[in-house]
Amino acid sequence: MSVSDWLMQFPIAHRGLHDISLGVIENTISAAQRAIDHGFAIECDVQSSADGIVMVFHDDTLDRLTGRSGKINQLNCAQLELTELLNSKDTIPTFVTFLEKVNGRVPIICEIKSEFDGNLELAEKTAQAVRNYRGPLAIKSFDPLVVAAISKLIPERPCGFIGESTYDDPEWDFLSPSQKKSMACLTHLDQTRPDFLSWYINDLDQGPPQLARKLLGLPLMTWTIRTNENLQKAREYADQIVFEGFIPESPHQSE
């Protein structure tokens, strides 16, 4: 499907419009509400609980944002819903609860986390959760297999591939050289057929994302915009931003 205008219209608040100084933590209902109040779209991340419930949370471990340690997939949904986030009254929400709270008021861009092990259960359950959601919503993932699966499971929802050009951060050491090359050079496009791309700001002006944008007509968003310098680069090379740490003006306000 073609990407709807709404996906490129409103700047996207990275994990919601969070601000720890205000007690508003990433990927919470409070962060979503603050984004809604400012008229921004919301990016959120989903992981699976031990009992297979789709939860809104970025890290695969609880340590950074809660008073607990260990992996998120070692606790069940009930335990996670009672887990308070540091410096906040929020707890970890289910994806279904998150959808109910947003209720179509602004677009949601949901990133499906993956361990790149071929397990598509989280993708399947995420697709099931959004089937009856009436608001604007798109899916994206770093994992080409997840992108391909979502595109088949819910073709009515825009689905995008998240990429970068080097994959030289240690977090990507588990990937083979051939996987990194395929993802960086977008050689998987015939299989994944994404509706849009989401590319790392530092690599935004590189050949693959720009060729895909100009020759294939793939809309291009970029992450994560934290400075005015990056914002100017994004305006030159991309169609949409995922931002954090400041309040950008709407592109329509600057016209």
Predicted segment positions?
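Phosphate-group recognition and catalysis centered on beta-loop-alpha active-site segments
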Residues: 1-255
